[in-house]
Amino acid sequence: MCDDEEEEEATPLVCDNGSGLVKAGFAGDDAPRAVFPSIVGRPRHQGVMVGMGQKDAYVGDEAQSKRGILTLKYPVEHGIVTNWDDMEKIWHHTFYNELRIAPEENPCLLTEAPLNPKANREKMTQIMFETFNSPAMYVCIQAVLCLYASGRTTGIVLDSGDGVSHTVPIYEGYALPHAILRLDLAGRELTNYLMKIMTDRGYSFVTTAEREIVRDIKEKLGYVALDFEQEMLTAATSTSLEKSYELPDGQVITIGNERFRCAEALFQPSFLGMESAGVHETVYNSIMKCDIDVRKDLYANNVLSGGTTMFPGIGDRMQKEMVSLAPSTMKIKIIAPPERKYSCWIGGSILASLSTFAAMWIKKSEYDEAGPAIVHRKCF
């Protein structure tokens, strides 16, 4: 912090509100200071012990650790905030408990999914200025930030988080809105699917707390097969793919072909009973909606981002699928940076610390004058 006359601005905050995880921290840092689940938990049972300081709601990791006695709710579904009261609790927790700052002193950069309803943006703006008294704020599209983080200005981003996946072609820093495609198939659907196929195997996972166990199994043991049919044969004929997992109560379960059947749903949504195209076809369709002159650059810059792209083997599989879809002479490159789980946040951190960005913030005075609709004018 420099305390010069012209530089009394506080460090901007960057808050990436995902459907599954909140990533929050300070602009200029290379990783988010706070990462916790976007969960609000409310007790399912009557409190009997007085004076324990039981709360009526728990947020994030605390909700996660007490999940056995709570009903867990995610206020963000498919990238869209569905419960604003809970969302406010999450932001409050972020500012006061995790980052320990006063939101009325620091400008705040928020992120949102592309093709989100306009009302969603306005409500975010309103809460920031009216509830938290932000001095300034900005709303940015997640995928654009991911590209910033990878150091490119042109490319197509496949951003797949917990609630929503989308493909966003960006050329020379401009998102091409007509070619953005959205797929409501992401980490949460994969977790639900894994719950279902584990149940077929005879293990029962039903409650919201058990879903978190399955999510952990998915993250620790899941992977993407290069050739699904071949992998299924291998799994059927040998035990080389089997792994064991210890449940919280000490019971050990074995998981075999479920390890790659789960992530396969990204490429074959029909597994989930969805009629949409897989992620590889969605990327291809998105590229084909762009002008013919920019396609070559997009094929050569396929950037993966978001937690659901963390499955081992996804880059190779993506390469293979894209090669079979694209024209035969086309050079195809899949970029999967190791920090892609947080690349959206990192991009926000880069953007908010640029000196040229200072003019972009929506200031409180502007909000007071124009109301929530200002967000559509100022934030592209």
Swiss-Prot record:
Record field: catalytic activity: ATP + H2O = ADP + phosphate + H(+)
Protein localization: Cytoplasm, Cytoskeleton
Top enzyme category: hydrolase
PROSITE patterns: ACTINS_1, ACTINS_2, ACTINS_ACT_LIKE
Source domain of life: Eukaryota
Gene3D superfamilies: 3.30.420.40, Actin, Chain A, domain 4
Residue numbers bearing the N-acetylaspartate modification: D3
Prodomain positions: 1-2
Family as reported in the entry's similarity comment: Belongs to the actin family.
Function: Actins are highly conserved proteins that are involved in various types of cell motility and are ubiquitously expressed in all eukaryotic cells.
PANTHER family, per the entry: ACTIN
Name of this chain's protein: Actin, muscle
